[in-house]
C-alpha cells in the first residue's frame, strides 16, 4: 500500500468504499492467473465492534487489536479459468470483518522467550444471518477452558442486544479437533434465555487467505504485483499446520423469545494446544 492507507489497491486486488460502513466493492483482475471478481457488499445492519483483545506471552504483548464485524449481502460475479459464479444479493448473505491494532503478521520474532511452552489458542468465532435478524458470538479460552475473551450480539431492524453469560457445549469428531456440533446459550438484557445449535456442513481452509500459510503469510512482501493461488481437495482433511485453521459453513438453529428460526453462518475454528474441557493435553492431540 506504499505507506498510504487511502490507497486500497494491492496488485490485482482493489477495495472501494462506496458508502462508509455500509457498502464496499471488491475488484480482482488477474489475467496471468485467470482470476477475476467484481463483488459488492451491502450491510444489513450497523457494524458490531467487538471488545478490545489483548493477549500476552509473559511480558510480551502478542496481540492488541479491535475488530468490527458486519452482516450483509453480496452481489456480482467470480470467475476462475472457465468457471463463473453469479452472486445475487437475494441468495448470498454473509459477513465481513476488519481489525486494527497489533497482530502477529510478517516474519516471526527470531528471539524465543524462555521457558519454552506449548502454544495454546482456543478460538471460536460464529457470525450468522437469519431472515429478519443476525447474530454473532465468539470465544477465546485458556488451557483450563476459562474464557479470556467472549462476546455475543443479536441484531434486529430496530434493536441491538448485547448478551451476557455466554456458554458453550462442544462435540468433536472422534480422534480430531474438528467440531461435529456446537451448542451456545446466553442471556439477553431482559433476562430471557437464547440458544443456538450449529451443525457444520463443509469447511474451507483459512491458509487460503494467508493464515499460517508457509509461503504467503500475512504481511509478507513478495513484490509489487506478485500473486498465487492454492488448490485444496476439501474431501481430505489434514490436521497439521497450515490446515488447523478453518471456517465451517453451518446450519444455525436459533431459539429466541420462544421462537425457533434457521439461518446460515460460519464457525471459525482454531484449536491449538491444551484445553481441559475438551480433553486436549498436547499440541495437536484429538478428541478421545
Please tell me what each predicted stretch does.
Residues 1-288:
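Structured soluble/peripheral alpha/beta segments that form catalytic or ligand/cofactor-binding pockets
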